[in-house]
């Protein structure tokens, strides 16, 4: 394809603002016109289970069920509630019940590992506290060792609250044939309010806390904010999730011992921040508890799939390099997994008897060649400068990637499918070790240029040499290439990144990424992974993020046939399952759509008091479903008002009020919260 010097110059200039690595010292705008909307911050009819229900980590005989209780007075507890599991949406055919407790130490979250279940079975569950019922959730156990003909998974990643509406979650909730939703990380983002997202939504989708999150209380509050999104609630309600974290659950471009977006000292210690982020994750996500707080694990889906979930962030990753010419990049001991996890992965691959070995992980695994975009640059070393921007992915750890691919090849392991998130793009790759040769040559017009040529490792026409395939899911909402570099630039890059590039009639630099069979750098959404005895197929679906919408479009489908280990295009999405489960009902048990005889519908919810007890700073986290006059005071045990904290008109939304009580005496205090004519009270203790 022909292009112009102007294109290469523009692309190079744009690349100086890293297309994926974000930093909180820069305001990133998405300048698109949007229709202003303002949905409720919580559903008062769901009290005290405002955050809905969820399930996760299904095994053949058990599954995690989750909820969050929101006590009206935010006492520390403990609070006792009951749960039940049934085979019908009305929760009439109950097969198990039990009681459990929660308290402030768990941020009032609840997890139950329900055992003794039947394999490959759809169940419905719910919680009750003080006579009030939660939403009913739907979940499904894995088939275990049993034979299974077809599996379907929704695959998602990168849901930035302020970048757009979670419409893709809504569409996944509408599906009745999913075995689970696989979330590959960046479930939340750590940035301060108004820093990273769509500026037209900063008011509409306000973040709490408003600052960058660092402490346990701040991570908890951010999860609480996300989990009040109705689309996310519905997705969790209707399908079990299987999750791993990526970097933004802690901080941007994190690794074992630090992160690009962490300043040691000024933001506390990385050890403390990482520990707080992990604790909040395990509290708010329906993942099975492990004392080690590790997230790499495997789940068997019958004879068809072994699902192997990896942690390429916090478990063992060494710090990212910033120079592709560094000798360290080819150090054979350099690791993104850590020694223990890598050995565990290799053993799982070698010992698997399942037809498909599906690896869920975070960052792009395949070789990703982008240095050619520097052709118009007069900067010495422009090729290396561009390539050095993309070392957070497996390209920054090439020797470990080679070791894994050698293991697959030498052990003749077929049907390996790699699932990838993180990059905010859709990709389908044939996975081969060094699928293209790159050499730098002198050119009188462009200076040093990369020339790409085929080699014996991989044949792009036949797929020979590939040992696996990789499917990358787009972001739910997080910024794509067009939102970082402009739509025109992204469209041109999308058209050229895996095609022959000819800057002028006399210069052909070849195809930099012939193993990349599908690319979309612009759209948001998810893909459905469909697995049968014949194929593993990814179907990409895209939806708008700038307005609430239930619309979506099917884009493309790519698949690998049994033992092919390379991709071919499919003409249509995989068909739905013939047997589909009934959806969980939209309202809690006993609640109908038309509620009568309510004189003063609830408009306020106290979502958290962090921490309690506290020493200096306390946060009051609350939500309004409508605008109201808010008056919040702090009283001591004698009834004397110590401080008026807030007295103003407040729009509906989610808020956190910070109180510095460092000069107060130790003891018991009470918040008095007046919302128009409604009065609430909450006790806190200063130690």
Residue positions per predicted region:
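Short strand-edge motifs at loop-to-beta-strand transitions and within beta-strands
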Residues: 108-112, 653-659
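Long, structured stretches of catalytic cores involved in phosphate-ester chemistry, encompassing
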Residues: 23-113, 117-592
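C-terminal tail/sorting-segment detector
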Residues: 21, 135-138, 643-644, 648-649, ...
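Surface-exposed loops/turns
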Residues: 119-120, 615-616, 626, 651-652, ...
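Bacterial N-terminal signal peptides
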Residues: 6-15
């Amino acid at each position: 394809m022909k292009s112009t010097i102007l294109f290469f110059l523009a692309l190079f200039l744009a690349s100086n603002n890293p297309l994926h690595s974000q930093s909180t010292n820069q305001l990133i705008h998405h300048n698109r016109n949007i229709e202003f909307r303002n949905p409720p911050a919580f559903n008062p009819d769901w009290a005290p289970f405002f955050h809905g229900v969820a399930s996760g980590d299904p095994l053949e005989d058990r599954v995690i069920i989750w909820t969050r209780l929101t006590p009206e007075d935010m006492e520390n507890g403990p609070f006792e509630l009951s749960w039940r599991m049934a085979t019908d949406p009305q929760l009439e055919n109950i097969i198990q019940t039990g009681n459990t407790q929660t308290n402030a130490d768990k941020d009032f979250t609840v997890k139950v590992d329900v055992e003794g279940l039947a394999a490959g079975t759809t169940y419905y569950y719910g919680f009750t506290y003080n006579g009030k019922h939660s939403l009913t959730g739907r979940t499904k156990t894995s088939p275990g060792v049993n034979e299974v003909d077809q599996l379907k998974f929704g695959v998602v990643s990168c849901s930035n609250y302020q970048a757009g509406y979670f419409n893709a979650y809504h569409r996944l909730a509408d599906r009745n044939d999913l075995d689970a939703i696989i979330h590959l990380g960046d479930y939340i983002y750590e940035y301060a309010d108004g820093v990273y997202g769509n500026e037209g939504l900063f008011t509409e989708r306000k973040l709490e806390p408003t600052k960058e999150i660092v402490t346990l209380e701040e991570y908890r509050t951010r999860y609480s904010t996300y989990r009040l999104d109705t689309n996310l609630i519905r997705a969790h309600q209707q399908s079990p999730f299987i999750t791993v974290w990526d970097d933004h659950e802690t901080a941007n471009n994190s690794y074992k011992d630090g992160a690009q977006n962490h300043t040691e000292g000024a933001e506390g210690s990385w050890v403390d921040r990482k520990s707080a982020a992990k604790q909040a994750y395990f509290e708010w996500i329906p993942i099975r508890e492990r004392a080690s707080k590790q997230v790499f694990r495997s789940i068997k889906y019958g004879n068809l799939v072994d699902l192997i979930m990896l942690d390429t962030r916090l478990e063992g990753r060494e710090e990212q390099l910033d120079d592709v010419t560094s000798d360290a990049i080819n150090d054979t001991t350099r690791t993104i997994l850590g020694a223990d996890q890598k050995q565990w992965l290799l053993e799982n691959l070698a010992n698997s008897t399942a037809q498909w070995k599906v690896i869920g992980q975070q960052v792009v695994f395949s070789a990703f060649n982008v240095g050619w975009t520097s052709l118009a640059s007069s900067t010495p070393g422009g090729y290396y400068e561009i390539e050095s921007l993309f070392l957070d992915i497996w390209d920054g750890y090439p020797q470990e990637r080679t070791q894994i691919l050698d293991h697959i090849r030498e052990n003749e392991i077929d049907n390996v499918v790699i699932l990838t998130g993180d990059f905010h793009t859709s990709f389908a790759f044939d996975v081969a070790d060094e699928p293209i040769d790159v050499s730098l040559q002198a050119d009188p017009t462009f200076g040093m240029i990369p020339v790409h040529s085929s080699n014996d490792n991989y044949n792009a026409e036949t797929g020979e040499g590939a040992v696996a395939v990789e499917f990358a899911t787009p972001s739910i909402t997080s910024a794509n290439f067009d939102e970082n570099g402009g739509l025109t630039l992204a469209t041109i890059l999308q058209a050229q990144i895996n095609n022959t590039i000819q800057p002028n009639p006399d210069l052909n630099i070849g195809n930099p990424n012939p193993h990349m069979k599908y690319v979309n750098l612009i759209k948001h959404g998810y893909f459905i992974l469909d697995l049968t005895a014949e194929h593993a197929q990814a179907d990409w679906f895209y939806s708008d993020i700038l307005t609430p919408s239930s619309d979506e479009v099917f884009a493309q489908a790519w698949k690998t046939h049994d033992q092919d280990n390379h991709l071919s295009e499919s003409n249509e999405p995989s068909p739905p399952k013939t047997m589909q489960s009934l959806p969980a009902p939209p309202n809690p048990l006993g609640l109908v759509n038309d509620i009568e005889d309510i004189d003063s519908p609830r408009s306020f919810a106290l979502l958290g008091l962090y921490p309690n007890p506290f020493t200096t700073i306390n946060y009051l986290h609350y939500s309004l479903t409508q605008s109201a006059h808010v008056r919040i005071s702090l009283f001591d045990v004698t009834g004397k008002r110590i401080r008026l904290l807030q007295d103003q008109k407040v729009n509906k939304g989610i808020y956190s009020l910070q109180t510095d009580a460092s000069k107060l005496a130790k003891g018991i205090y009470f918040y008095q919260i007046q919302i128009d004519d409604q009065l609430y009270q909450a006790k806190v203790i200063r130690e």
